[in-house]
Amino acid sequence: MLTLYTFHNSICTQKVFMTLAEKDLSYDEHLINLFAAEQYDPEYLKLNPKGVVPTLVHDGRAIPESSLICEYVDEMWPNSPLIPDDAFLKSRMRQFSKLVDETIFEATRELSFSAMFREKMKNMPAEKRE
């Protein structure tokens, strides 16, 4: 059984959605409302101590971090592999994934965060926004 803890506006969640769709896997979705700070719920922090989304739970075991989730899913369900068999090509795929995680995601995180939370935060007192 697969349960995916998500937030739909999360770029990382979208990456996992695409991987699960490519593998044609069904899963239960559990929405984590970041606006309500549900990512800090003690039960969720047991699954993902960083309190970020997404997190995949498979047979009671939690896998955090979108790139790790995608690799896990590809290894667990090897039909239609997404990761190449060739060691060199696999290293190139991981290099690209690392680039996305460490550079492109970091560059877009502030913009996507600002777009998502702008309306919510502009009505907050300044001390709460900090």
Predicted regions and their residues:
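GST-like domain detector, emphasizing the conserved glutathione-binding G-site
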Residues: 1-129
